[in-house]
Amino acid sequence: MHAPDADPRHFPMKELEFVLMMASFQALQALAIDIMLPALGAISRDLELADPNQRQLVIGVFLICSGLGSLFPGALADRFGRRPVVLTAIAAYMLLSVLCAISGSFQLLLVARGVMGAVTSAMMVMPTTILRDRFDGDRMARTQSLIVMTFMVVPMIAPMLGQTVLLFAGWRWIFGIMGVLAGCVFGWAWLRLPETLDPRNRQAVQFKVIAGNMGTALRERSSIGYFLGAAFTQGAMFGYLNSAQQLVGEHFGAGTLFPVLFGGMALVMACTNFANSRIVERFGARRVSHAALLVYIVLGVVHLLLAFRGEDLWTFLPLMTLSMCMMAFMGSNFQAISLQPFKRIAGAAASVMSFVRVVLGAVLGSLIGQAYDGTARPILAAMVVFGVIALLLVLYSERGRLFRRINPPEYYRNNPPAVTPPAS
């Protein structure tokens, strides 16, 4: 699995291929969530679940285990490199897709989904780490927005793909499609992905070193408010994902239109990420994300008040889509800001941030999902509360001041000094 170290100044991929490859890594993990949404009802009937809300565990267990597993890929990648970790994760994804497909009980399916989430968490951590290897600050936020915009194709088409499979075959075939797609991405990465870890930044695989690097990431005030804030807003989104099929498909009566409506929301979010990639280098990641967070809170309050007065699908959907768009403006920018201080330990920092963001977000999302009462009120109330908490956390990181430009890498004590290339 060895590839020559890539000099960032002479990276072998053009930007388009790089964006597509990083998006494909993240898309595989998103596919494991979104393609399952139309199948949850079929799984519930086929495996004879007593409580209809249990079906949400197919999503919730995967997300929680993804967060728990994300502690490890970064530390391994800081020692052995990004490429071997990525390839191992994709290979495991293929094998575990087969195990999910042949599961004979709901318990075995949950175990397989949990292991799949843990092992393949690298596919969310590594793109961020590789991106941090190559870019800083607002440029990183711009490229991350392009990656997210591209990867948003998955939630646009995955539910419709899952629905199509169910028309012609059982839910188990969905996992077969996941395995085949993972095989294609594995071949592409094997042939084209170079190693981006600077040999000077290679870290030892020792508990003391790993714990020290993760502790450094957790102690950085300028970072912690952003990735904790992202965890709370992501928790609200996970809560919506967990309940989306019941809320939109059943309560609001969308029925078979649910995958189309879900995909339409994802399309709008993809456009938002493209807009972010166009404006973030001009206005700065902080200014864009701070404005989005404030609008997100206001939208949540307005939507919650409407929900108590009574709403239909065509009131709910536009307002929820606007809220998700604000999350799109926050996501890439929060990530870039929180990783800015950690060029030397990018893998460990990305891992611990992903762990906190996904585990906390998944736990909060599962609690929201289990609180589903046949209305949108639990989700909307969580969005307001979690949005306010995120704002307080950002204010802590910013020492009470919003809308500043992002600091250069050399501002932070955790980053090595810039190396000037020798004159030719």
Positions of PLM-derived features:
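Juxtamembrane intracellular "pre-TM" segments in multi-pass secondary transporters
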Residues: H2-P12, P194-Y226
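Residue-level signature of mid-helix packing/kink "hotspots" within the transmembrane helices
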Residues: D34, L63-L71, P155-M156, A266-F274, ...
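Extracellular/periplasmic helix-loop-helix junction of adjacent transmembrane segments
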Residues: A39-L68
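Helix-breaking motifs and short loop linkers at transmembrane-helix boundaries and internal kinks
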Residues: L49, G81, I102-L108, V119, ...
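Conserved MFS/SLC helix-loop-helix module at the cytosolic interface between two early adjacent transmembrane helices
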Residues: L68-Q107
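Paired small-residue
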Residues: A92-L99, Q107-V115, W314-L322
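Helix-loop-helix hairpin linking two adjacent transmembrane segments in secondary transporters
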Residues: L108, D138, R142-L191, L197
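Cytoplasmic helix-loop-helix junction between adjacent transmembrane helices
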Residues: A112-V153
